[in-house]
Amino acid sequence: MRFIGSKVNLLDNIQEVIEENVKDDAHVFMDLFSGTGIVGENFKKDYQVLSNDSLYFSYILLKAKIENNSIPNFSELKKIGIKEPLHYLENEEFEISHEFFLTHNYSPYMGCERMYFTVENASRIDFIRLTLNRWKNESLINELEFAYLLAILIEAVPFISNISGTYGAYLKHWDKRALGKLKLRTLDIGNNHYANKTYNEDANSLIEKVYGDILYIDPPYNGRQYISNYHLLETIALYDYPEIYGKTGLRPYVESKSLYCQKKEVGNAFNHLIEKANFRHILVSYSSEGLLLEEEIESILKSHGLPETYRIYKMPYRKYKSKHKQEASELHEYIFYIQKDIALTNSVKSNKKIEVGKHKTNSYIKSPLNYVGGKHKLLNQIVPLFPDKIDTFVDLFSGGFNVGINVNANKIIATDINTYVVEVLDTMKKTSVEEVIAHIERRIEEYGLSKSNEEGFKAFRNYYNKTKKPLDLYTLICYSFNYQFRFNNNQEYNNPFGRERSQFSPALKKKLVLFIEALHEKNVQFVCSEFEHFNFSQLDQNDLVYCDPPYLITTGSYNDGNRGFKDWNRLQEIKLLDILDHLNSKGVYFALSNVLSHKGLENELLLEWSKKYNIHHLQHSYSNSSHNTTRGESQEVLITNYTNYTK
């Protein structure tokens, strides 16, 4: 779900900081200001995770996905005939009563002016919350089962909320997404075989009671109180019938105000936190426009840690859109690191690999190819919408293969028009992990490739353009600007050097190994072909064609300039839509990724065509969203010709 300050785009950076500085055998990782838990979920595969957030709705998400190590079986509900709780909660009939708090206060019911939800969706949320409370009170569900079901509801609510980013305000007119029906999607729970623990406390109080090895601190940066932006999710989670006020129906939050959002208090609060932290390794995320200055943070860290271990890492900050403009060059996201003179914990590290139930939401494999338009950040929304049983999966515009690598099918056919991309992926499929890594490291040594050696990079680029070996291309990309594919009209690789940014880092190596291992486990065939030349006659009703074509109305260029050396235009779009109509007439399932609107533009052709199929609205952006987010930005969708995901 979207959350201000989400660190989804910094996970690789955090991983690299840990790999560079944590050389001992750390076991316990704590995420002290967890938010929606994206960091804790990411590191659950490696450590025992302690997570905390002062907001109750965040705590529920953490308890469900981090503390919980398995998908609940709801044994008591099954005894009374409720075998599928989500189906029951979505479809059971009810009548609106005086207890339906959201219906009466946040939907246009009985004269209420607030338009956060339609009456249908608000009343369904109310029914679910009242039902969960009743089940819990009657001991039909335990604490973890309650958290699991409530977390599913919390994650589903933003998809049908009539807002532009947060709950600081509702829209005056109904957004198309808000008119859809509330859908409950299962959570995928990773089992790391540790006793993970979740807290719902003030960070400065909790820090005196916990201990571990790695402490990750991501406090609020400025004066905006998170509770005002997420008050409605907090009310849904607590369902405590608060005395709301104001046009937007805010809940009282004076006692919930964070010290980190108050200029006079933030310095003392942060100093207390670092002083009392009983952790050997400390990482702090912060922003160059935060209330604390870089020098203040450095001084506090060095005063309580080992000064010689202090490090600071600066990343360009993709600021969410605001009324207050600043030059992008002035904005940075920081990761601070320091080590304290504290012994490691004595917990025994588990040798078991993490096991993930159902769809691998927090364990999706990410392609090692940085291909513009890649769907890795949307996989946890797209993959659950695929049928459970697929014979042949066709990834018609496979690009970096982010989607195909994460699909369970008896056979996967990945096609793309870009010869070079297909050759790289096919070579990885046919070559052992050891050989791939050895080849890359040999080239790095031969040409002295590094973040600073531009001459070595240029020499290697010249060598590649003469030989065109696929693994050399991948190695070259690792040291290129933004890790991108880019060729000129003579089919020569011409992406410039990625000075001080791009390298074959330990994190990238790990990503590559995981990708190749997954690739070797699947029955994959890579094909270089234009989409209209694919042999669709070989498909039947047990197959699925997934399409992620270039988007007709977006202005962003693809890695090679035209996504595979060919422009995408209205004629190409019509060809593809005709093919999908033909597949539908033959009973073959399809799923199309696209955007209906983008920065004020609408794809009228797609809008009209899609009316005869099912449209699933996706959360396009996960990070740095706020109530100032501009309406009309990309409305990402998945269009399918089926509704039942289990075949």
From Swiss-Prot:
Pfam families: MethyltransfD12. A motif (Adenine-specific methylase 2) lies at residues 548-551. Disulfide bonds: none annotated. The lineage of its organism: Bacteria, Bacillati, Bacillota, Bacilli, Bacillales. Belongs to the N(4)/N(6)-methyltransferase family. Keywords: DNA-binding, Methyltransferase, Repeat, Restriction system, S-adenosyl-L-methionine, Transferase. One of its GO terms (biological process) is DNA restriction-modification system. It comes from the Bacteria. PROSITE patterns: N6_MTASE. The 2 adenine-specific methylase motifs of the protein participate in modification of the two strands; the first motif modifies the sequence 5'-GGATG-3', the second motif modifies the sequence 5'-CATCC-5'. It catalyses: a 2'-deoxyadenosine in DNA + S-adenosyl-L-methionine = an N(6)-methyl-2'-deoxyadenosine in DNA + S-adenosyl-L-homocysteine + H(+). GO terms for molecular function: S-adenosyl-L-methionine binding; sequence-specific DNA binding; site-specific DNA-methyltransferase (adenine-specific) activity. This is Type II methyltransferase M.FokI. A motif (Adenine-specific methylase 1) lies at residues 218-221. Its EC number is 2.1.1.72. Monomer.
